[in-house]
A protein has these predicted regions:
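Histidine-rich, glycine-flanked metal-binding segment
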Residues: 2-21, 28-77
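Divalent metal-coordination and catalytic microenvironments
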Residues: 26, 41, 46, 71, ...
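Metal-associated gating/positioning segment near the N- to mid-region
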Residues: 70-134
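Active-site mouth loops of central-metabolism enzymes
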Residues: 81-94, 115, 143-156, 225-229
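Alpha-helix-loop-beta-strand connector modules within alpha/beta enzyme cores
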Residues: 124-141, 189-200, 352
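Histidine/acidic residue-rich metal-binding segments in metalloenzymes
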Residues: 155-324
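His/Asp/Glu-enriched, well-ordered alpha-helical/loop segment
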Residues: 221-249, 317-318, 322-323, 329-404
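C-terminal cap of metal-dependent C-N hydrolases
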Residues: 339-342, 395-446
């Protein structure tokens, strides 16, 4: 595979250490303060040295590389808290190399990888493998989630302390809910003792049953079994009650219904250490987009009614929803070109998360700074990471993008190994032009 085809560059450690880099004449998005100003950013030795209106060519070191952004937006690199990377065990779907290529092209500088791989990330050796592979083959930062239970079987608690020491950023069983409430209570207690964050996929699988899309009139018209929104809410409500009992830190991986939002709102009002995310798909698409059984829009959780989508957008705008994720889940052609009931769940999203989110900005539903905050500073705060902010001393993970540049999503040009995008041939606005990690350019559009 010819790397030049992807217009992606490996960072040179020498250039990071010795050549300052400045992005000038930019529309700076400061997500911590929900503020936009014109100015620039200076990165030295991989860290933000300064930013603001005073960053202009006349005030920079003589040997600095200067990039004139021509009024484009500059923001912290995006942090995606929920992505499936096939390595190890499903490299035919995605590898760290291909996923981080896609991420760099989409403005994502930190990927948080799900643990439901083969083998699962339930031993320190697997965490170490992922971190080494990311160093050797990755273009952006990759942080592994480790399992809550051994083998992801929902029974025996994993060695959370050892996994944390090995480098796991948080703990989850991936797209599997822990059914047993007693086990979940013990998991939360154990995680609390290590101040570890629990990220849980809330779904009552018994209630969801054989459902393949959102329960309702549209599912009935298509003749497909539905999944009641209560399947999410019941499990989430149980989890929040257990958080209240244990005092653990809890993050709902994906909330997709107004019922769930009510539960989250009450938990936050009660002072519990609870946060939540939703996917860019659930913010920008609804069940009607499935149309004539489009399997690329068969997702888990399923796309919901338009009223639910609007409730999610309102919750994002208010700050009730903390983070927006790609829910990247590559599936190959053989598992998607099947009848809807037989097709696998999931869609790719690393490369389109930002541009899809900008649809909400262009429609007037969300301010740009609020959208960027949900993809940068809030995930960083939840995971206790130094990146995701415009701040002196923060890592020089930055992106430059034109929020108004139009393009059509061409699956053949996407960098992911699989092409199951829900935005196939969709018209978008918002192109990433440059991505930096630790002060080094890892992607630059031609």
């Amino acid at each position: 595979m010819d790397e030049s085809e992807f217009r992606v560059k490996r960072s040179s450690p020498t250039s990071i250490a010795h050549q300052p880099l400045a992005l000038v004449n930019a529309r700076l998005i400061d997500p911590a303060h929900l503020r936009e100003t014109m100015g620039g950013v200076l990165v030295v030795d991989g860290l933000i040295r300064d930013f603001g209106a005073a960053i202009m060519p006349a005030n920079l070191p003589a040997h600095a590389r200067i990039i004139d952004c021509g009024g484009d937006c500059v923001a912290p690199g995006l942090i995606d808290m929920w992505a499936f990377i096939g390595e190890p065990g499903a490299e035919h779907r995605e590898t760290i190399a291909t996923a981080t290529l896609a991420a760099a092209a989409g403005g994502i500088t930190t990927i948080v990888a799900r643990p439901d791989t083969n083998p699962p990330v339930d031993e320190a050796a697997v965490v170490d493998f992922l971190l080494r592979r990311a160093r050797d083959t990755g273009r952006v930062r990759l942080l592994p989630l480790a399992a809550l239970t051994a083998g992801l079987d929902g029974a025996e608690i994993a060695e959370i302390g050892l996994l944390q020491l090995a480098g796991a950023v948080a703990f989850s069983d991936g797209a599997r809910a822990i059914r047993n409430a007693r086990v979940m209570r013990r998991v939360l207690q154990y995680a609390r003792d290590f101040d570890a964050l629990v990220i849980h996929y809330a779904e009552d699988r018994d209630l969801a049953g054989e459902g393949v899309m959102n329960e309702g009139e549209f599912a009935s018209r298509l003749g497909l079994a539905g999944i009641a929104r209560e399947a999410e809410a019941i499990m989430l409500d149980r989890d929040i009650r257990l958080v209240n009992l244990t005092g653990a830190r809890y993050h709902a991986a994906l909330v997709t219904t107004a019922l769930s939002l009510d539960i989250i709102a009450k938990a936050k009002a009660d002072g519990l250490a609870v946060t939540c995310a939703t996917s860019i798909n659930h913010l920008t698409l609804n069940e009607n987009d499935i149309g004539d059984y489009r399997t690329f829009l068969k997702l888990a959780p399923p796309l919901r009614h338009e009223d639910e989508r609007r409730a999610l957008v309102a919750a994002l705008e208010s700050g009730l929803i903390d983070a927006v994720v790609s829910d990247h889940n590559p599936q190959d052609v053989e598992t998607k070109r099947l009848p809807f009931t037989e097709a696998e769940d999931g869609a790719i999203g690393l490369e389109t998360m930002l541009s899809a989110g900008l649809r909400l900005v262009h429609s007037g539903e969300i301010p740009l700074a609020r959208l960027i905050a949900a993809m940068t500073i809030r995930p960083a705060e939840i995971l206790d990471l130094p990146q995701g902010r415009l701040k002196i001393g923060a890592p020089g993970d930055l992106i430059r993008f034109d929020p108004d540049e139009p393009f059509v999503v061409d699956p053949a040009k996407l960098h992911s190994r699989c092409k199951n995008t829900p935005f196939d041939e969709a018209r978008m606005e918002g192109k990433v032009k440059l991505t930096m990690v630790a002060g080094g350019i890892v992607y630059e559009a031609e």
